[in-house]
Amino acid sequence: MMPERFSFDFRPIDQYWTRAKGACSNTKRGNMYILASLALILLHLLVLPIYLYLTWHHKYWRKRGLVTARPLTLLGTYPGLLTRKSNLVFDVQKIYDKYKGKHRAVGVFVTRQPQILVLDPELAHEVLVSNFRCYKDSLQSSYLRHAKWDKYARLNPFWASGQSWRRLRTDAQAGISGSRLRQAYNIWEQGGQMLTEYMTQQVAEKNNILETRDLCFRYTAHVMADFIWGIDAGTLTRPMEQPNKVQEMASKWTSYAFYMLTLFMATIVAPCSRLLLRFRFYPKETDEFFSNLTKESIELRLKAGDSTRTDYLSHLLQLRDQKQATHDDLVGHALTVMLDGYDTSGTALLHALYYLAENPAVQQKLRVEILSCMASEKSLDFEKLSSLQYLEQVIYESLRLSSLIPQYTKVCTLPTVIRLSESKSLDVEVGMTIMIPNYQFHHDKQYFPEPEAFKPERFDNGAYQELMRKGIFLPFSDGPRICMGVPLAMLTLKSALVHILSNFQVVRGRDRLIPKGDSGFGVVLQGDVNLEYRRFFR
């Protein structure tokens, strides 16, 4: 008989084992929670110094008694500069709308850099004119002082720093004085006639529709090449399909310069990177081209022995002979005038023609003024052109609406004080930047009722001078560093508009074009601008 098999009841042990497994599982879970908590604490310890570094300066203006426009942690007050999703004009507009009328200025941050945003036009006038000695430099000039590799940009008075800008401005400006432009007026008169002939040929071939951006830059390239270097650029004589070197290089040069201005602002979070990366506003290729063009033009003029022609090239020769100006000095002066006369004048002409096409009543009123002054003549002399008051008003109103340079940024060069109110003032330290938002002034209904309407009559009876004196209207800036090319630009715009409107009616297409802001600074017409030009005969 087999012995009975021994059996043991494990159920109590299983019960304890299950509990033990549960306890072990809970222990693991608890350890995970502890590790996660430690990781979060460590992350906070790592992030906190970064956060404090990015935000500790946000009290900068509050400590100094200036109201602060709340900045974002990393992006500052103008996030579009880094994200590239909005235009600087729109970022400034939000702050301007919130604080204008309440404060003369507010504190802002360009990424991490503190800056003063002017909201009161009278304060803008103080910075640009009455207290200019404390704000001599611009943001770009403070950089170019060290960028010795960008030699021609450094020779432009617009970007020059310290005391050099005054000498450069004096030498460059003497060649575009009112008396000198009067003597050289035939260049613009002949250029206007060539423009009319070119347009007549083009409208016949293209069913009256012309891409106006190209048209405007062809004209400014022609008159600037003739005036500065004494050459025919061929922009109004060669077929459109043939490439033109002067216009091609001028467009490449100015496009690069304005792109670098945008990039320059975007890198303000790390200013040292500009010098490390050797930022330059003028590309090497165009530097070489315009250097050779200046050299060859001087050689041709000397070889021809023509000392009677009054233009900018003859002025450059005088600087070389009388002031021992170097070749680089001459190229720098030539490019200074080219920048004013080619790109900014071409863009201003484009917008003026579009606004006239959009406002036929204004266009007709201007045409009547032009034709009445011409009487039986087919052209206007310099004095008659200068006497056209409504033409000048049209140009000013176009410049107000387009605001090609929407803001000016000045740098404090001497310690000074800004009066914020009757009882409060702000000490401004050397190196502090101050932005003047002239686009916002130009589009403020407090100063310009119906600001988006095109009304040249706003500038009737010399209102232009009064608005400038109050710091409200600043298309050319103001003060000692006001754009020196104003007479040149006005002559170029007036001559072109007179020749176009005395021979063509400008008509807008079906769709209205709206100036847009890309990721840069301005709010201007983008892409092709196709307008209809209907020829009529007087």
From Swiss-Prot:
Reported cofactor(s): heme
Record InterPro entries: Cyt_P450 (IPR001128), Cyt_P450_CS (IPR017972), Cyt_P450_E_grp-I (IPR002401), Cyt_P450_sf (IPR036396), Insect_CytP450_Detox (IPR050476)
Gene Ontology cellular component list: endoplasmic reticulum membrane
Keyword field: Endoplasmic reticulum, Heme, Iron, Membrane, Metal-binding, Microsome, Monooxygenase, Oxidoreductase
A GO molecular-function annotation: oxidoreductase activity, acting on paired donors, with incorporation or reduction of molecular oxygen
PROSITE patterns in the record: CYTOCHROME_P450
Signal sequence bounds: none
Pfam families: p450
The protein's role, per its UniProt record: May be involved in the metabolism of insect hormones and in the breakdown of synthetic insecticides.
Protein name, as recorded: Probable cytochrome P450 309a2
